[in-house]
UniProtKB/Swiss-Prot annotation:
This is Anthranilate phosphoribosyltransferase. The lineage of its organism: Bacteria, Bacillati, Bacillota, Bacilli, Bacillales. GO terms for biological process: L-tryptophan biosynthetic process. Anthranilate 1 binds at residues 79, 110. Its cofactor is Mg(2+). Mg(2+) 2 binds at residues 224-225. It comes from Oceanobacillus iheyensis (strain DSM 14371 / CIP 107618 / JCM 11309 / KCTC 3954 / HTE831). Keywords: Amino-acid biosynthesis, Aromatic amino acid biosynthesis, Glycosyltransferase, Magnesium, Metal-binding, Transferase, Tryptophan biosynthesis. Binds 2 magnesium ions per monomer. GO terms for molecular function: anthranilate phosphoribosyltransferase activity; magnesium ion binding. It catalyses: N-(5-phospho-beta-D-ribosyl)anthranilate + diphosphate = 5-phospho-alpha-D-ribose 1-diphosphate + anthranilate.
Length: 340
């Protein structure tokens, strides 16, 4: 442990096993808050590696009581956060579009850390439970093609670091690992990163964690989602191959909008935006979701191209299928609360 800490301070990279050892001590409460803060800041100053991100992700997954291998291919779509854009909950809304298009989605998310409203905040406002059991998650995936896994609920170990993350108020290695720690085995994934320098690192980490196919994207204007503002950079991960690409909204029939057209607000405001999108109301919000869901459908192999993915996403919304997935999740949540 001391050797690994010394390496971090000296700005030397850790192996997967070394980083796992460090954070096993952190999660066992053998490290003070000030020491943990120093570790996180030192890692950030050094620059986190794919091996370190993958190793920490594995530690968190190994401690989760929600580890699940579903009988069908599963995907997740999630951004790292940290872009300070105050955009609405794009990936949360897109998740229902994916499910409506026939993709099984284990949506992993949290409350707000460095943004105004997190996925858990907006879903809770809509009436979705944040405390499903492992068996209930499996049932929802089976019957409704989408389940929500609240990070603080499915990862008890994160409670040990929550206060420090909140106090620091800056993106740390935990922002990178958030999308990678889903306790449900994922076959494919769509990940947004706020930092273009992190594209390769996060893509490699996803590869190390066994994703068969993934897209890691950095949006125009610094979004951790695909943006309608201009050209977006992404990496396609497919087995042992990493391929750098770009995508512009006009290439898939979507108009250009500045990022300030997709500003969000508090949980109530974002819930209303989400509902307006799933009801198909024309706006920059809708087109942003079509863009991101389209890319995710391509990542999942449900669509042969991003253009086809956008059209499939549009059909998911216009048919009412996407909205029905949300309504089913709310209904299931009510039944669960009545039993309790």
């Amino acid at each position: 442990m001391k050797h690994s800490l010394h390496k971090i301070i000296e700005r030397q990279d850790l192996s997967t096993e070394e980083i796992k050892e460090v954070f096993k001590h952190c999660f066992s409460q053998e490290v003070s808050d000030s020491e943990l803060a120093a570790i996180l800041i030192s890692l950030k100053m050094k620059g986190e590696t794919a091996e370190e991100v993958a190793g920490l992700s594995q530690v968190i997954q190994e401690h989760s009581p929600f580890l699940l291998n579903f009988h069908q291919p599963v995907m997740d779509n999630c951004g790292t956060g940290g872009d300070r854009s105050n955009s609405f909950n794009i990936s949360t809304c897109s998740a229902f579009v994916l499910a409506g298009a026939g993709v099984t989605v284990a949506k992993h998310g949290n409350r707000s850390v460095s943004s105004q409203t997190g996925s858990a905040d907006v879903l809770e406002k809509l009436g979705v439970s944040l405390a499903f059991t492992k068996e209930q998650v499996n049932e929802m995936l089976d019957k409704n093609q989408i389940a929500f896994l609240f990070a603080q609920h499915v990862h008890p170990t994160l409670k040990q670091v929550g206060k420090v993350r909140k106090d620091l108020r800056i993106p740390t290695i935990f922002n990178f690992i958030g999308p990678l720690t889903n306790p449900v085995h994922l076959d494919s994934q769509y990940i947004g990163v706020y930092d273009p320098e992190a594209l390769q690192m996060v893509a490699k980490a996803a590869q190390l964690l066994g994703r068969e196919r993934a897209i890691v994207i950095h949006g125009a204007g610094g979004l951790d989602e695909a943006s309608l503002q201009g050209e977006n950079k992404y990496i396609l991960v497919e087995n042992d191959r990493l391929e750098e690409k770009t995508i512009h909204p006009e290439e898939v029939g979507l108009s250009v909008y500045p990022n300030d057209e997709i500003q969000g607000g508090n949980a109530t405001e974002n819930a209303n935006i989400l509902l307006s999108v799933l009801k198909g109301e024309d706006s920059a919000y809708l087109d942003t979701v079509l863009f991101n869901a389209g890319i995710a459908l391509f990542a999942s192999k449900k669509a042969d191209s991003i253009y086809d993915g956008v059209e499939l996403a549009r059909e998911s919304i216009t048919s009412g299928s996407a909205l029905s997935k949300l309504n089913n999740l709310i209904t299931f949540s009510k039944k669960v609360s009545e039993v309790v």
